[in-house]
């Protein structure tokens, strides 16, 4: 699984060298931000059901046509699958926060997602809207500390950009 640490070590090993000072500074910065990332991961894990419901509800409010016949949310089973997918992405963001890198999203969430959604006639814009809602709804200090909010938002932005 890719993280800042594994990326630095892999690059150094591929070049047949020890990690450079800038490599070590990158790792040190990542470690210094770990407390904020873990705070964000804890808050997300503790509130994930509400986060997923609010994100999914916001998506269907913005894209009400998705509940029309022939669309991605035409029946309760398909609506539930959309919420399941939002939950899956939130879990991957949580994993990214824990490991301090985008490996989980890259490996389990983004690779091929656009092609799958296109094949199944599922608009990625709806998922982007639900993730953006979560990012925009975040309130510091109500939900988490400022630094934890920065870390959480960074991974949400990464996911939004990857699905856009």
UniProtKB/Swiss-Prot annotation:
Q: What membrane topology was assigned to this protein in its record? A: Peripheral membrane protein
Summarize what the UniProt record says about post-translational modification.
Contains two covalently linked bilin chromophores.
List positions binding (2R,3E)-phycoerythrobilin 1: 82
UniProt-annotated binding residues for (2R,3E)-phycoerythrobilin 2: 139
Q: What is its main location?
A: plastid
Q: Which UniProt keywords apply?
A: Antenna complex, Bile pigment, Chloroplast, Chromophore, Electron transport, Membrane, Photosynthesis, Phycobilisome, Plastid, Thylakoid, Transport
Quick one: a GO cellular component term?
Answer: chloroplast thylakoid membrane
- InterPro entries attached to this UniProt entry: Globin-like_sf (IPR009050), Phycobilisome_asu/bsu (IPR012128), Phycobilisome_asu/bsu_sf (IPR038719)
Biological processes per GO annotation:
photosynthesis
Where in or outside the cell it occurs: the entry states: Plastid, Chloroplast thylakoid membrane
UniProt keyword annotation of Chloroplast present: yes
Q: Which domain of life is it from?
A: Eukaryota
- What does this gene product do? Light-harvesting photosynthetic bile pigment-protein from the phycobiliprotein complex.
Q: How does it assemble?
A: Heteromer of 6 alpha, 6 beta and one gamma chain.
The UniProt similarity line reads: Belongs to the phycobiliprotein family.
What name does this protein carry?
B-phycoerythrin alpha chain
Give the species.
Porphyridium sordidum (Red alga)
Quote the gene name from the UniProt entry.
cpeA
């Amino acid at each position: 699984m890719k993280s800042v640490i594994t990326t630095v070590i892999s690059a150094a090993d591929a070049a047949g060298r020890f990690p450079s000072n800038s490599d070590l500074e990158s790792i040190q910065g990542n470690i210094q931000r770990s407390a904020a990332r873990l705070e964000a991961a804890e808050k997300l894990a503790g509130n994930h059901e509400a986060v997923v419901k609010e994100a999914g509800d916001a998506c269907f409010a913005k894209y009400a046509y998705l509940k029309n016949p022939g669309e991605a949310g035409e029946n309760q089973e398909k609506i539930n699958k959309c919420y399941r997918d939002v939950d899956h992405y939130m879990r991957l963001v949580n994993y990214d926060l824990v490991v301090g890198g985008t490996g989980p999203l890259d490996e389990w969430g983004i690779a091929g997602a656009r092609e799958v959604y296109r094949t199944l006639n599922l608009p990625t814009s709806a998922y982007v809207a639900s993730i953006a809602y979560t990012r925009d709804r975040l309130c510091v200090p109500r939900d988490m500390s400022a630094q934890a909010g920065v870390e959480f938002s960074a991974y949400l932005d990464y996911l939004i950009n990857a699905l856009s």
